[in-house]
Amino acid sequence: VILDLEDSVGAADKAAARDHIAAFLDEVTDAQVLLRINAADTIHYHLDLALAQHPNLAGVILPKAEAQSTNATADILSCPLWPLIESVRGLSELPATVRVPGVARLLYGTLDLALELGLDSNQEGGLSMLNQGRFLLLTESLMAGLPAPIDGVCPAVHDDDQLRRTAQYSYAAGMGGMMCIHPKQVALVESIFTPSEAQIEWARAVEKAAVTQHSSFQFRGQMVDEPVLKLARKIVARSK
């Protein structure tokens, strides 16, 4: 769950939002809660950082993340940092950003990046450009030993068909999950990014069969080598 202090909260309401979030965090001890603070170049950043020290937070999301702001924020925090990459500079500085100690996972801010570049993500050309960003996030995450990045939101809150297509596309593109802009989107997105029972059964069976093998082997008519075994392990990990 992401508690947001940035775009969803107007400037006049940010102080009250911090108070409400602090009160909520005081009441929870085992919730997996991330806090999205305001960007480092805003007047709200340092006030948000004080709240970001709360011990019941699982992590902090830094919007408009670049290498310098990621490094400065990670130095202050005691919890994992999730940089939200949503600018051209953020993309260009990914090799440095992913290697900042404390960075847990990348998120992809497709809406803001599309706005900066003047892209229409509903058209093939705009989608193709955003895919180049996905490729960069995926490869840099892999090189740094981070989990697959989390994709941007689908703004169509009341269009389940569009949400399904967007989530399926994101899953096929190798992304590790997808942010939701509204709670009603969670169940559908989760169902797409969660392996099916058949996939889980296959993956566990492959892992079990591999225990007694020392090289490539055949399993249910399929050749299993190291890449296939890695896929099976990834499916099992996702199922958890």
Give the location of each predicted region:
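Expand to "…catalyze enediolate/carbanion chemistry for C-C bond making/breaking, isomerization
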Residues: 1-240
